[in-house]
Amino acid sequence: MKVDDPENKVNNKFRYDKLSKASLIVSILLSIILISTIILRERGLQKTEELRKIYYEGTDLTELSKKSEVQKSEPHKIQKSFEELLKINPETVGWIKAGNLADEPVVYRDNEHYLKYDFYGHRNSIGTVFIDAHNSDWKHSKYLILYGHYLKNGGKFGSLKRYKNIEDLKNNLTITWNTIYEDEPEEYVVFSVFESSMLKSEKDYFYLRRFEELKTGEKEIEKLIEELKKRSIYNIPVEVSPNDKIMCLVTCSYGTRDGRLLVFSRKIRPNEVVDTLKDKIIKKTEFTNEK
């Protein structure tokens, strides 16, 4: 009959207690990190509300529209609404408002920094909405790409997921892009919404910078526009031509590997009325459910 060694029992108990304490410490540290992340996110979203107050208190879009007619031949001047924002962050380039789904300041730098830093320059996982680094001439570019994090509470570009709902699309069909300069804000109308992968190995892969690299003529651009409309989950009766200015809003989506939700819009033409389009929009297919 085997007799347990009392010393082994003591050693085993000591090792067990040591492992238990280590597990407890790790659990506590992970909890602290999680709580800290949540607190930082909430503070970041509160700060965004402060930025909106600064921006809208200094903005008179009616007066700005009148000024733009006079100032078209003058050098660009900074709008009053952006003066305070530029003091906080000199890399500010504009403000994006996608109906009631996104209302954010926009910055320009590289494609990495603002994934992890807020508008105030603090490290924060909510990031900041930014223009693609390849849009260096963002003021005159005919194709703009704007990135924003997907937050489950709807912050940043998180609420763009509501474009999956046809009623939300109809209610948020237009997007306003206002640069820091004293020009009239540009109005855009959505013409394509779809999910894609950033991985070349996936069948739903889409290369975002294709517009920039199409310099061979209008036919190639027309084919790309046709592809965007074909990929869209909606039939949206918006005519798009190679001469139109196009904007793409990008956020993460979890229905495919390394997925992105892409919302394409084009600049509204002079005297164009888009409200009448709402009743003509048809949904073609369903999105993959979010995880």
Where are each of the predicted segments found?
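Solvent-exposed, non-transmembrane regions of membrane-associated and secreted proteins
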Residues: 31-291
